[in-house]
Amino acid sequence: MKIAVAQMRTTAGELERTAERMVELAKKAADEGAQLVVFPAAALMGVWPVDPPSQEGLLLDLAEVLVKISEEVPCPCIVPVLSDADGAPAPEAMLVHDGELTPLKLSALLRSSATGQTDKHAGEGLEEDGPAPDLPVFELGGVHFGLAFSFDDLNDFDDYDFDVDVVLYLDGYGFAMDDPSSAMGVSVSDGRFMDDAEATGAWIVGVGSLGTYGTQVFTGSSFVLTPWGELAAQSPSFEEDLLIADVDPELNGPLDHPLNPEVYDCPLVAWNALAQGLTESLSQMGFTQAAVLVDGTLDSSAVATLATDALGPTNVHALLVTGIDDKLDSSARRLAENLRLPVRELPMAALSPDHALAADLAQAHLVALAREEGAMPLSNLDKTALALEVLPGSMPRAGLAPLGDVYRYAVIELVHMRNTISPVISRTSRHAFEVPAIPGIEECGPTPESRLDFVDYVLASHIEWGRPLSDIADDGGHPQVVSAILDRLASCEPARMSCGPVIVASSRTLEDVAWPLGMMWRDRARTKAERAGEGIGGTISLGDDLDEAIAQAAEELGSVAGSHDASKGQQGGEEASVPATPRDREKDMRDILNLLRDFSLTGGLAADQPEGRSGRHGQGGRPGPGGTPGDSSIWRTFSEN
Protein backbone atom coordinates (compact mmCIF):
# COMPACT_ATOMS: atom_id res chain seq x y z
CA MET A 1 0.00 0.00 0.00
CA LYS A 2 1.22 3.47 -0.84
CA ILE A 3 0.84 5.80 2.14
CA ALA A 4 1.20 9.57 1.82
CA VAL A 5 2.14 11.90 4.68
CA ALA A 6 1.10 15.50 4.01
CA GLN A 7 3.64 17.46 6.05
CA MET A 8 2.03 20.90 5.91
CA ARG A 9 2.49 24.21 7.70
CA THR A 10 -0.83 25.62 8.88
CA THR A 11 -2.40 28.14 11.21
CA ALA A 12 -4.45 26.60 14.01
CA GLY A 13 -8.17 27.16 13.57
CA GLU A 14 -7.93 28.42 9.98
CA LEU A 15 -10.39 25.68 9.14
CA GLU A 16 -11.61 26.49 5.65
CA ARG A 17 -8.19 27.36 4.21
CA THR A 18 -6.59 24.28 5.77
CA ALA A 19 -9.39 22.04 4.50
CA GLU A 20 -8.91 23.37 0.97
CA ARG A 21 -5.20 22.59 1.13
CA MET A 22 -5.91 19.12 2.52
CA VAL A 23 -8.16 18.36 -0.44
CA GLU A 24 -5.51 19.65 -2.86
CA LEU A 25 -2.79 17.51 -1.27
CA ALA A 26 -5.05 14.44 -1.19
CA LYS A 27 -5.75 14.82 -4.91
CA LYS A 28 -2.05 15.20 -5.65
CA ALA A 29 -1.21 12.14 -3.55
CA ALA A 30 -3.95 10.08 -5.21
CA ASP A 31 -2.58 11.04 -8.63
CA GLU A 32 0.75 9.55 -7.52
CA GLY A 33 -0.91 6.31 -6.46
CA ALA A 34 -1.41 6.90 -2.73
CA GLN A 35 -4.13 4.75 -1.16
CA LEU A 36 -4.11 6.54 2.22
CA VAL A 37 -3.21 10.14 3.08
CA VAL A 38 -2.34 11.03 6.68
CA PHE A 39 -2.38 14.64 7.89
CA PRO A 40 -0.43 15.97 10.94
CA ALA A 41 -1.99 16.07 14.39
CA ALA A 42 -1.80 19.87 14.70
CA ALA A 43 -2.83 20.75 11.14
CA LEU A 44 -6.47 21.74 11.72
CA MET A 45 -6.75 22.82 15.34
CA GLY A 46 -3.28 23.09 16.85
CA VAL A 47 -2.38 21.34 20.09
CA TRP A 48 -4.40 23.16 22.75
CA PRO A 49 -8.21 23.39 22.91
CA VAL A 50 -10.17 26.61 23.06
CA ASP A 51 -11.99 27.60 26.24
CA PRO A 52 -15.14 25.57 27.10
CA PRO A 53 -17.67 28.32 26.25
CA SER A 54 -16.27 28.40 22.69
CA GLN A 55 -16.30 24.63 22.17
CA GLU A 56 -19.81 24.42 20.75
CA GLY A 57 -19.26 26.96 17.99
CA LEU A 58 -15.88 25.52 17.08
CA LEU A 59 -17.24 21.98 16.82
CA LEU A 60 -20.10 23.14 14.57
CA ASP A 61 -17.67 24.83 12.18
CA LEU A 62 -15.35 21.83 12.37
CA ALA A 63 -18.20 19.49 11.43
CA GLU A 64 -18.92 21.54 8.29
CA VAL A 65 -15.26 21.41 7.28
CA LEU A 66 -15.01 17.66 7.83
CA VAL A 67 -18.10 17.04 5.72
CA LYS A 68 -16.55 19.12 2.94
CA ILE A 69 -13.32 17.11 3.13
CA SER A 70 -15.23 13.81 3.05
CA GLU A 71 -17.10 14.89 -0.07
CA GLU A 72 -14.06 16.07 -2.03
CA VAL A 73 -11.05 13.88 -1.23
CA PRO A 74 -10.46 11.14 -3.82
CA CYS A 75 -8.93 8.56 -1.46
CA PRO A 76 -9.08 7.53 2.21
CA CYS A 77 -7.58 10.09 4.59
CA ILE A 78 -6.87 10.43 8.29
CA VAL A 79 -7.70 13.92 9.55
CA PRO A 80 -6.77 14.60 13.21
CA VAL A 81 -8.93 16.92 15.31
CA LEU A 82 -8.77 18.15 18.88
CA SER A 83 -11.36 18.39 21.62
CA ASP A 84 -11.40 19.14 25.32
CA ALA A 85 -11.55 16.63 28.17
CA ASP A 86 -11.74 18.35 31.56
CA GLY A 87 -9.48 21.16 30.36
CA ALA A 88 -6.87 18.90 28.79
CA PRO A 89 -6.30 18.22 25.08
CA ALA A 90 -8.15 15.15 23.80
CA PRO A 91 -6.90 14.28 20.30
CA GLU A 92 -9.04 12.30 17.89
CA ALA A 93 -8.52 11.06 14.34
CA MET A 94 -11.26 10.97 11.72
CA LEU A 95 -10.99 8.27 9.07
CA VAL A 96 -12.46 9.70 5.87
CA HIS A 97 -13.47 6.85 3.56
CA ASP A 98 -16.14 6.60 0.85
CA GLY A 99 -17.78 9.82 2.01
CA GLU A 100 -18.07 8.64 5.61
CA LEU A 101 -16.37 9.94 8.76
CA THR A 102 -15.28 7.50 11.46
CA PRO A 103 -13.83 8.80 14.77
CA LEU A 104 -11.19 6.14 15.36
CA LYS A 105 -10.50 6.66 19.08
CA LEU A 106 -14.19 6.93 19.98
CA SER A 107 -14.97 3.83 17.92
CA ALA A 108 -12.21 1.90 19.66
CA LEU A 109 -13.48 2.98 23.09
CA LEU A 110 -17.07 2.01 22.34
CA ARG A 111 -15.97 -1.29 20.84
CA SER A 112 -13.91 -2.07 23.94
CA SER A 113 -16.80 -1.23 26.23
CA ALA A 114 -19.29 -3.27 24.23
CA THR A 115 -17.20 -6.40 23.81
CA GLY A 116 -15.22 -6.39 27.05
CA GLN A 117 -11.93 -5.98 25.24
CA THR A 118 -10.57 -3.82 28.04
CA ASP A 119 -9.30 -6.94 29.78
CA LYS A 120 -8.23 -8.79 26.64
CA HIS A 121 -4.56 -8.03 27.09
CA ALA A 122 -4.47 -8.03 30.89
CA GLY A 123 -1.40 -9.73 32.26
CA GLU A 124 0.48 -9.63 28.95
CA GLY A 125 2.69 -6.70 29.93
CA LEU A 126 4.17 -5.17 33.00
CA GLU A 127 0.86 -3.62 33.99
CA GLU A 128 -2.30 -5.50 34.83
CA ASP A 129 -4.85 -3.07 33.44
CA GLY A 130 -3.99 -3.62 29.77
CA PRO A 131 -3.63 -1.05 27.01
CA ALA A 132 -5.71 2.11 26.69
CA PRO A 133 -9.28 1.15 25.74
CA ASP A 134 -9.43 3.91 23.10
CA LEU A 135 -6.30 2.80 21.23
CA PRO A 136 -7.39 2.75 17.56
CA VAL A 137 -6.81 -0.40 15.50
CA PHE A 138 -8.47 -0.57 12.08
CA GLU A 139 -8.24 -2.31 8.73
CA LEU A 140 -8.00 -0.63 5.35
CA GLY A 141 -7.28 -2.29 2.02
CA GLY A 142 -6.20 -5.51 3.69
CA VAL A 143 -3.64 -3.72 5.90
CA HIS A 144 -4.09 -3.60 9.68
CA PHE A 145 -3.27 -0.23 11.19
CA GLY A 146 -2.66 1.00 14.71
CA LEU A 147 -2.75 4.71 15.52
CA ALA A 148 -0.78 6.46 18.28
CA PHE A 149 -0.94 10.07 19.42
CA SER A 150 1.52 9.78 22.30
CA PHE A 151 4.49 7.85 23.60
CA ASP A 152 2.09 6.14 26.00
CA ASP A 153 0.16 4.85 22.99
CA LEU A 154 3.39 3.63 21.40
CA ASN A 155 4.29 1.90 24.67
CA ASP A 156 0.98 0.02 24.52
CA PHE A 157 1.70 -1.19 21.01
CA ASP A 158 5.18 -2.22 22.19
CA ASP A 159 4.04 -4.03 25.33
CA TYR A 160 0.89 -5.81 24.14
CA ASP A 161 0.22 -8.21 21.30
CA PHE A 162 -1.64 -6.22 18.66
CA ASP A 163 -2.09 -7.70 15.20
CA VAL A 164 -1.02 -4.61 13.23
CA ASP A 165 1.05 -4.22 10.09
CA VAL A 166 1.56 -0.45 10.36
CA VAL A 167 1.62 1.91 13.34
CA LEU A 168 0.83 5.53 12.48
CA TYR A 169 2.38 7.92 15.01
CA LEU A 170 0.89 11.42 14.86
CA ASP A 171 3.27 13.68 16.76
CA GLY A 172 1.58 16.13 19.11
CA TYR A 173 4.46 16.89 21.46
CA GLY A 174 6.57 19.53 19.75
CA PHE A 175 10.34 19.86 19.75
CA ALA A 176 12.21 19.49 23.05
CA MET A 177 15.97 19.72 23.42
CA ASP A 178 15.98 17.08 26.16
CA ASP A 179 14.13 14.48 24.04
CA PRO A 180 15.74 13.31 20.77
CA SER A 181 12.53 11.57 19.68
CA SER A 182 10.80 14.95 19.45
CA ALA A 183 12.89 15.82 16.38
CA MET A 184 11.26 12.86 14.56
CA GLY A 185 13.08 11.56 11.46
CA VAL A 186 16.18 13.70 11.71
CA SER A 187 17.02 12.00 15.02
CA VAL A 188 15.65 8.54 14.28
CA SER A 189 18.96 6.87 15.15
CA ASP A 190 18.96 8.56 18.60
CA GLY A 191 15.26 8.35 19.46
CA ARG A 192 12.85 5.60 20.38
CA PHE A 193 11.27 4.71 17.04
CA MET A 194 13.67 1.97 15.93
CA ASP A 195 12.94 0.21 19.22
CA ASP A 196 9.21 0.63 18.55
CA ALA A 197 9.58 -0.98 15.13
CA GLU A 198 11.44 -3.93 16.61
CA ALA A 199 9.00 -4.35 19.51
CA THR A 200 5.84 -4.19 17.38
CA GLY A 201 7.16 -5.97 14.30
CA ALA A 202 5.30 -3.32 12.30
CA TRP A 203 6.11 -0.48 9.97
CA ILE A 204 6.31 2.84 11.84
CA VAL A 205 5.01 5.89 9.97
CA GLY A 206 5.93 9.06 11.87
CA VAL A 207 3.71 11.99 10.91
CA GLY A 208 5.40 15.22 11.95
CA SER A 209 3.47 18.44 12.46
CA LEU A 210 5.16 21.55 11.07
CA GLY A 211 5.02 25.09 12.39
CA THR A 212 4.42 26.89 15.67
CA TYR A 213 1.19 26.31 17.56
CA GLY A 214 0.86 28.52 20.60
CA THR A 215 4.48 28.61 21.70
CA GLN A 216 5.25 24.98 20.80
CA VAL A 217 7.47 24.38 17.80
CA PHE A 218 7.06 21.42 15.45
CA THR A 219 9.89 20.61 13.08
CA GLY A 220 8.31 18.20 10.59
CA SER A 221 10.76 15.47 9.52
CA SER A 222 8.14 12.78 8.95
CA PHE A 223 9.52 9.31 8.30
CA VAL A 224 8.79 5.67 7.49
CA LEU A 225 10.63 2.84 9.28
CA THR A 226 10.54 -0.84 8.36
CA PRO A 227 9.88 -3.49 11.04
CA TRP A 228 13.58 -4.41 10.93
CA GLY A 229 14.70 -0.81 11.50
CA GLU A 230 15.64 0.48 8.05
CA LEU A 231 14.71 4.04 7.13
CA ALA A 232 12.48 3.76 4.06
CA ALA A 233 11.58 7.44 3.60
CA GLN A 234 12.03 10.79 5.35
CA SER A 235 10.81 14.36 4.88
CA PRO A 236 13.08 17.33 5.54
CA SER A 237 12.84 19.34 8.74
CA PHE A 238 11.27 22.83 8.68
CA GLU A 239 9.87 22.37 5.15
CA GLU A 240 6.55 21.31 3.69
CA ASP A 241 6.61 17.96 1.92
CA LEU A 242 4.32 15.31 0.48
CA LEU A 243 6.02 12.07 1.47
CA ILE A 244 4.80 8.94 -0.35
CA ALA A 245 6.15 5.53 0.64
CA ASP A 246 5.30 2.00 -0.44
CA VAL A 247 4.51 -0.02 2.71
CA ASP A 248 4.42 -3.77 2.13
CA PRO A 249 3.40 -5.90 5.17
CA GLU A 250 4.55 -9.04 3.33
CA LEU A 251 8.09 -7.77 2.84
CA ASN A 252 10.66 -9.26 5.19
CA GLY A 253 13.58 -7.07 4.12
CA PRO A 254 16.02 -5.73 3.47
CA LEU A 255 15.09 -2.75 1.30
CA ASP A 256 16.84 -2.33 -2.02
CA HIS A 257 17.66 1.32 -1.37
CA PRO A 258 17.26 2.30 2.30
CA LEU A 259 18.15 5.79 3.48
CA ASN A 260 21.07 6.38 5.81
CA PRO A 261 19.85 7.97 9.07
CA GLU A 262 21.29 11.41 9.75
CA VAL A 263 23.67 12.16 12.59
CA TYR A 264 21.51 14.14 15.00
CA ASP A 265 22.89 17.63 15.67
CA CYS A 266 20.72 18.83 18.55
CA PRO A 267 22.12 22.41 18.80
CA LEU A 268 21.60 22.97 15.07
CA VAL A 269 18.03 21.64 15.11
CA ALA A 270 17.32 23.60 18.30
CA TRP A 271 18.61 26.86 16.80
CA ASN A 272 16.45 26.42 13.71
CA ALA A 273 13.46 25.47 15.86
CA LEU A 274 13.87 28.61 17.97
CA ALA A 275 14.22 30.75 14.84
CA GLN A 276 11.04 29.26 13.40
CA GLY A 277 9.27 29.68 16.72
CA LEU A 278 10.32 33.32 16.98
CA THR A 279 9.19 34.18 13.45
CA GLU A 280 5.82 32.49 13.74
CA SER A 281 5.14 33.56 17.33
CA LEU A 282 5.63 37.21 16.39
CA SER A 283 3.39 36.73 13.35
CA GLN A 284 0.66 35.24 15.55
CA MET A 285 0.94 38.30 17.81
CA GLY A 286 0.67 40.66 14.84
CA PHE A 287 4.34 41.65 14.54
CA THR A 288 6.95 41.29 11.82
CA GLN A 289 9.77 43.14 13.58
CA ALA A 290 11.60 42.88 16.90
CA ALA A 291 13.60 45.17 19.18
CA VAL A 292 16.57 43.75 21.09
CA LEU A 293 18.83 45.07 23.83
CA VAL A 294 22.50 44.42 23.01
CA ASP A 295 25.09 44.91 25.76
CA GLY A 296 27.78 42.40 24.80
CA THR A 297 26.70 39.68 27.22
CA LEU A 298 26.13 36.07 26.16
CA ASP A 299 22.34 36.06 26.27
CA SER A 300 21.92 39.45 24.59
CA SER A 301 24.27 38.39 21.78
CA ALA A 302 22.42 35.10 21.34
CA VAL A 303 18.99 36.77 21.21
CA ALA A 304 20.15 39.43 18.72
CA THR A 305 21.71 36.80 16.45
CA LEU A 306 18.68 34.51 16.68
CA ALA A 307 16.32 37.37 15.87
CA THR A 308 18.43 38.35 12.86
CA ASP A 309 18.50 34.78 11.55
CA ALA A 310 14.74 34.51 12.03
CA LEU A 311 13.53 37.90 10.79
CA GLY A 312 16.36 39.38 8.74
CA PRO A 313 18.52 42.37 9.76
CA THR A 314 16.11 45.00 8.44
CA ASN A 315 13.41 43.75 10.82
CA VAL A 316 15.52 43.84 13.99
CA HIS A 317 16.16 47.08 15.86
CA ALA A 318 19.08 47.08 18.31
CA LEU A 319 19.32 49.21 21.44
CA LEU A 320 23.07 49.26 22.11
CA VAL A 321 23.58 49.76 25.86
CA THR A 322 27.16 50.84 26.61
CA GLY A 323 29.22 51.89 29.60
CA ILE A 324 29.20 48.65 31.59
CA ASP A 325 32.59 47.42 30.39
CA ASP A 326 34.87 48.57 27.57
CA LYS A 327 35.40 45.03 26.22
CA LEU A 328 31.68 44.33 26.28
CA ASP A 329 30.98 47.65 24.55
CA SER A 330 33.42 46.74 21.79
CA SER A 331 31.90 43.27 21.43
CA ALA A 332 28.38 44.67 21.28
CA ARG A 333 29.30 47.15 18.54
CA ARG A 334 31.11 44.43 16.57
CA LEU A 335 28.08 42.15 16.83
CA ALA A 336 25.75 44.85 15.52
CA GLU A 337 28.13 45.46 12.62
CA ASN A 338 28.43 41.74 11.85
CA LEU A 339 24.65 41.37 11.83
CA ARG A 340 24.16 44.69 9.95
CA LEU A 341 21.58 45.88 12.46
CA PRO A 342 20.21 49.41 12.73
CA VAL A 343 21.47 50.67 16.09
CA ARG A 344 20.43 53.24 18.67
CA GLU A 345 23.08 53.73 21.37
CA LEU A 346 22.19 54.30 25.01
CA PRO A 347 25.03 55.10 27.47
CA MET A 348 24.35 53.70 30.94
CA ALA A 349 25.98 56.74 32.55
CA ALA A 350 23.26 58.93 31.09
CA LEU A 351 20.59 56.92 32.87
CA SER A 352 21.62 56.61 36.52
CA PRO A 353 24.71 55.95 38.65
CA ASP A 354 22.68 53.17 40.29
CA HIS A 355 23.40 50.10 38.14
CA ALA A 356 20.12 48.33 38.95
CA LEU A 357 18.07 51.45 38.23
CA ALA A 358 20.00 52.05 35.00
CA ALA A 359 19.24 48.48 33.88
CA ASP A 360 15.53 49.01 34.55
CA LEU A 361 15.57 52.28 32.63
CA ALA A 362 17.31 50.56 29.73
CA GLN A 363 14.41 48.10 29.60
CA ALA A 364 11.99 51.03 29.47
CA HIS A 365 13.97 52.52 26.57
CA LEU A 366 13.78 49.15 24.78
CA VAL A 367 9.99 49.17 25.08
CA ALA A 368 9.90 52.76 23.81
CA LEU A 369 12.06 51.81 20.80
CA ALA A 370 9.79 48.85 20.06
CA ARG A 371 6.69 51.04 20.25
CA GLU A 372 8.26 53.61 17.95
CA GLU A 373 9.20 51.00 15.33
CA GLY A 374 6.04 48.91 15.63
CA ALA A 375 8.11 45.98 16.88
CA MET A 376 7.91 43.39 19.65
CA PRO A 377 10.53 43.82 22.40
CA LEU A 378 12.48 40.64 23.09
CA SER A 379 13.63 39.61 26.55
CA ASN A 380 17.18 38.30 27.05
CA LEU A 381 16.16 36.05 29.95
CA ASP A 382 17.07 32.37 29.64
CA LYS A 383 15.56 29.48 31.61
CA THR A 384 18.27 29.67 34.28
CA ALA A 385 17.54 33.36 34.82
CA LEU A 386 13.78 32.81 34.97
CA ALA A 387 14.31 30.00 37.46
CA LEU A 388 16.75 31.71 39.82
CA GLU A 389 17.39 35.38 39.01
CA VAL A 390 14.02 37.11 38.65
CA LEU A 391 13.31 38.19 42.20
CA PRO A 392 9.96 39.30 43.63
CA GLY A 393 9.63 43.06 43.46
CA SER A 394 11.97 43.45 40.49
CA MET A 395 10.91 45.15 37.28
CA PRO A 396 9.33 42.60 34.90
CA ARG A 397 10.90 42.12 31.47
CA ALA A 398 8.54 42.94 28.65
CA GLY A 399 8.02 40.94 25.51
CA LEU A 400 8.71 37.44 24.26
CA ALA A 401 11.69 35.49 25.67
CA PRO A 402 13.09 33.36 22.80
CA LEU A 403 15.55 31.64 25.16
CA GLY A 404 13.21 31.47 28.15
CA ASP A 405 13.02 27.66 27.98
CA VAL A 406 16.75 27.13 27.28
CA TYR A 407 19.23 26.70 30.14
CA ARG A 408 22.23 29.03 30.14
CA TYR A 409 24.74 26.24 29.67
CA ALA A 410 22.78 25.17 26.57
CA VAL A 411 22.90 28.79 25.33
CA ILE A 412 26.70 28.50 25.38
CA GLU A 413 26.42 25.39 23.20
CA LEU A 414 23.97 27.08 20.83
CA VAL A 415 26.26 30.09 20.41
CA HIS A 416 29.24 27.83 19.76
CA MET A 417 27.26 26.01 17.05
CA ARG A 418 26.06 29.30 15.50
CA ASN A 419 29.63 30.59 15.33
CA THR A 420 30.67 27.56 13.28
CA ILE A 421 28.31 28.86 10.57
CA SER A 422 29.66 32.42 10.75
CA PRO A 423 31.70 33.77 13.69
CA VAL A 424 29.54 36.78 14.52
CA ILE A 425 29.75 36.55 18.34
CA SER A 426 33.09 37.45 19.92
CA ARG A 427 35.02 35.36 22.40
CA THR A 428 34.46 38.06 25.01
CA SER A 429 30.68 37.81 24.61
CA ARG A 430 30.76 34.01 24.65
CA HIS A 431 32.33 34.15 28.12
CA ALA A 432 30.20 37.07 29.37
CA PHE A 433 27.75 35.14 31.50
CA GLU A 434 27.09 34.94 35.22
CA VAL A 435 26.71 31.91 37.44
CA PRO A 436 23.63 32.37 39.66
CA ALA A 437 24.62 33.62 43.11
CA ILE A 438 23.85 30.51 45.15
CA PRO A 439 25.56 30.04 48.55
CA GLY A 440 28.31 27.44 48.26
CA ILE A 441 28.30 27.30 44.45
CA GLU A 442 32.06 27.96 44.37
CA GLU A 443 32.58 24.43 45.69
CA CYS A 444 30.73 22.88 42.74
CA GLY A 445 33.38 23.28 40.07
CA PRO A 446 36.75 24.86 39.31
CA THR A 447 35.49 27.07 36.45
CA PRO A 448 32.43 29.24 35.85
CA GLU A 449 31.35 26.82 33.10
CA SER A 450 31.47 23.80 35.41
CA ARG A 451 29.60 25.64 38.17
CA LEU A 452 26.93 26.77 35.71
CA ASP A 453 26.70 23.20 34.42
CA PHE A 454 26.00 22.01 37.98
CA VAL A 455 23.28 24.62 38.50
CA ASP A 456 21.55 23.66 35.26
CA TYR A 457 21.95 19.95 36.04
CA VAL A 458 20.07 20.46 39.31
CA LEU A 459 17.32 22.48 37.61
CA ALA A 460 16.89 20.03 34.73
CA SER A 461 16.88 17.04 37.07
CA HIS A 462 14.10 18.64 39.11
CA ILE A 463 12.06 20.23 36.30
CA GLU A 464 12.38 18.03 33.21
CA TRP A 465 13.11 14.72 34.90
CA GLY A 466 10.97 15.20 38.02
CA ARG A 467 13.58 13.84 40.42
CA PRO A 468 13.41 14.43 44.20
CA LEU A 469 15.99 16.64 45.86
CA SER A 470 17.56 13.70 47.70
CA ASP A 471 18.15 11.78 44.47
CA ILE A 472 19.80 14.79 42.86
CA ALA A 473 22.07 15.27 45.88
CA ASP A 474 22.94 11.56 46.01
CA ASP A 475 24.10 11.61 42.40
CA GLY A 476 25.64 15.07 42.11
CA GLY A 477 26.73 15.76 45.67
CA HIS A 478 26.65 19.17 47.39
CA PRO A 479 23.28 18.64 49.13
CA GLN A 480 23.22 22.10 50.71
CA VAL A 481 23.77 23.77 47.34
CA VAL A 482 21.08 21.60 45.75
CA SER A 483 18.68 22.63 48.52
CA ALA A 484 19.57 26.30 48.04
CA ILE A 485 18.99 26.10 44.27
CA LEU A 486 15.56 24.53 44.64
CA ASP A 487 14.66 26.95 47.44
CA ARG A 488 15.53 29.87 45.14
CA LEU A 489 13.48 28.26 42.36
CA ALA A 490 10.42 28.29 44.62
CA SER A 491 11.09 31.79 45.95
CA CYS A 492 11.23 33.29 42.44
CA GLU A 493 7.77 31.99 41.51
CA PRO A 494 5.90 35.29 42.15
CA ALA A 495 8.29 37.22 39.89
CA ARG A 496 8.01 34.66 37.09
CA MET A 497 4.27 35.24 36.94
CA SER A 498 4.84 38.74 35.55
CA CYS A 499 7.30 37.68 32.85
CA GLY A 500 6.30 37.35 29.21
CA PRO A 501 5.80 34.17 27.17
CA VAL A 502 8.62 31.85 26.14
CA ILE A 503 9.16 29.62 23.12
CA VAL A 504 8.83 26.05 24.39
CA ALA A 505 12.07 24.10 23.86
CA SER A 506 11.87 21.43 26.55
CA SER A 507 9.57 18.68 27.77
CA ARG A 508 8.64 20.76 30.82
CA THR A 509 8.60 24.51 31.16
CA LEU A 510 8.81 26.46 34.40
CA GLU A 511 5.08 27.12 34.06
CA ASP A 512 4.46 23.37 34.18
CA VAL A 513 6.11 23.07 37.61
CA ALA A 514 4.89 26.30 39.20
CA TRP A 515 5.36 26.40 42.98
CA PRO A 516 2.18 27.16 44.98
CA LEU A 517 2.14 30.77 46.16
CA GLY A 518 2.37 31.00 49.92
CA MET A 519 3.79 27.49 50.36
CA MET A 520 6.50 27.89 53.02
CA TRP A 521 7.59 24.24 53.18
CA ARG A 522 10.82 23.38 51.41
CA ASP A 523 12.34 19.97 50.80
CA ARG A 524 15.79 18.98 52.07
CA ALA A 525 18.29 16.23 51.44
CA ARG A 526 17.33 13.11 53.38
CA THR A 527 19.13 9.92 54.34
CA LYS A 528 18.05 6.56 52.96
CA ALA A 529 16.81 5.62 56.43
CA GLU A 530 14.56 8.69 56.53
CA ARG A 531 13.21 7.99 53.05
CA ALA A 532 12.47 4.39 54.01
CA GLY A 533 10.23 5.66 56.81
CA GLU A 534 12.29 4.46 59.76
CA GLY A 535 11.29 6.05 63.03
CA ILE A 536 7.68 6.61 62.00
CA GLY A 537 6.47 3.97 64.44
CA GLY A 538 2.72 3.65 64.70
CA THR A 539 1.89 7.28 64.07
CA ILE A 540 0.33 6.74 60.62
CA SER A 541 -2.88 4.76 60.29
CA LEU A 542 -5.47 4.34 57.58
CA GLY A 543 -7.84 2.82 60.11
CA ASP A 544 -7.45 -0.48 61.95
CA ASP A 545 -9.37 -2.50 59.37
CA LEU A 546 -7.30 -1.21 56.43
CA ASP A 547 -4.04 -1.46 58.39
CA GLU A 548 -4.79 -5.11 59.17
CA ALA A 549 -5.78 -5.85 55.57
CA ILE A 550 -2.54 -4.37 54.25
CA ALA A 551 -0.48 -6.22 56.84
CA GLN A 552 -2.24 -9.51 56.06
CA ALA A 553 -1.69 -9.04 52.32
CA ALA A 554 1.99 -8.33 52.94
CA GLU A 555 2.28 -11.49 55.09
CA GLU A 556 0.58 -13.58 52.41
CA LEU A 557 2.94 -12.26 49.76
CA GLY A 558 5.86 -13.01 52.05
CA SER A 559 4.66 -16.55 52.72
CA VAL A 560 4.21 -17.20 49.01
CA ALA A 561 7.73 -15.94 48.34
CA GLY A 562 9.06 -18.03 51.23
CA SER A 563 7.32 -21.17 49.95
CA HIS A 564 8.76 -20.56 46.51
CA ASP A 565 12.26 -20.17 47.95
CA ALA A 566 11.80 -23.29 50.04
CA SER A 567 10.71 -25.36 47.06
CA LYS A 568 13.71 -24.13 45.12
CA GLY A 569 16.00 -25.11 47.98
CA GLN A 570 14.43 -28.57 48.23
CA GLN A 571 14.83 -29.10 44.48
CA GLY A 572 18.52 -28.35 44.92
CA GLY A 573 18.84 -30.91 47.70
CA GLU A 574 18.94 -28.30 50.43
CA GLU A 575 16.74 -27.90 53.46
CA ALA A 576 14.97 -24.55 53.47
CA SER A 577 12.91 -23.06 56.23
CA VAL A 578 11.19 -19.77 56.82
CA PRO A 579 11.83 -18.59 60.36
CA ALA A 580 8.88 -17.22 62.21
CA THR A 581 9.28 -13.55 63.07
CA PRO A 582 7.21 -11.37 65.37
CA ARG A 583 4.86 -8.83 63.87
CA ASP A 584 6.79 -5.62 63.04
CA ARG A 585 4.40 -2.72 63.62
CA GLU A 586 6.92 -0.18 62.34
CA LYS A 587 7.37 -2.16 59.12
CA ASP A 588 3.59 -2.16 58.67
CA MET A 589 3.60 1.61 58.92
CA ARG A 590 6.42 1.85 56.39
CA ASP A 591 4.37 -0.33 54.03
CA ILE A 592 1.44 2.04 54.44
CA LEU A 593 3.68 5.05 53.83
CA ASN A 594 5.06 3.45 50.69
CA LEU A 595 1.50 2.81 49.52
CA LEU A 596 0.69 6.49 49.98
CA ARG A 597 3.80 7.37 48.03
CA ASP A 598 2.71 5.06 45.23
CA PHE A 599 -0.65 6.80 45.00
CA SER A 600 1.10 10.17 45.04
CA LEU A 601 3.40 9.20 42.18
CA THR A 602 0.71 7.61 40.03
CA GLY A 603 -2.17 10.01 40.58
CA GLY A 604 -3.98 7.88 43.13
CA LEU A 605 -7.02 6.03 41.89
CA ALA A 606 -7.40 8.16 38.75
CA ALA A 607 -7.12 5.24 36.39
CA ASP A 608 -7.97 7.34 33.39
CA GLN A 609 -4.91 9.54 33.80
CA PRO A 610 -1.93 8.82 31.52
CA GLU A 611 1.37 7.85 33.01
CA GLY A 612 4.62 9.72 32.64
CA ARG A 613 5.28 13.39 32.68
CA SER A 614 2.51 15.66 31.52
CA GLY A 615 2.49 19.43 31.75
CA ARG A 616 0.31 22.03 30.10
CA HIS A 617 2.24 21.53 26.91
CA GLY A 618 1.28 17.90 26.51
CA GLN A 619 4.65 16.32 27.17
CA GLY A 620 3.20 13.17 28.67
CA GLY A 621 4.98 9.88 28.45
CA ARG A 622 8.48 11.18 27.93
CA PRO A 623 11.28 10.19 27.75
CA GLY A 624 11.81 7.27 25.39
CA PRO A 625 14.19 4.38 26.00
CA GLY A 626 16.91 5.09 28.49
CA GLY A 627 14.87 6.60 31.29
CA THR A 628 15.98 9.48 33.44
CA PRO A 629 19.66 10.19 34.05
CA GLY A 630 20.83 8.67 37.28
CA ASP A 631 17.50 6.96 37.86
CA SER A 632 18.24 5.80 41.39
CA SER A 633 15.09 6.75 43.26
CA ILE A 634 14.09 4.32 45.99
CA TRP A 635 10.50 5.46 45.44
CA ARG A 636 10.02 3.69 42.13
CA THR A 637 6.33 3.27 41.44
CA PHE A 638 4.90 0.13 43.10
CA SER A 639 8.45 -1.10 43.73
CA GLU A 640 7.74 -2.27 47.27
CA ASN A 641 4.01 -3.05 47.28
Question: Where do the PLM segments sit?
Answer:
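ATP/NTP-dependent adenylation/nucleotidyl-transfer catalytic domains that generate, transfer
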Residues: P227, H257-G296, S300-R616, G621-N641
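Enzyme catalytic cores with a strong preference for nitrogen-chemistry domains
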Residues: M1-L293, A304-L320, K327-S330, R334-E345, ...
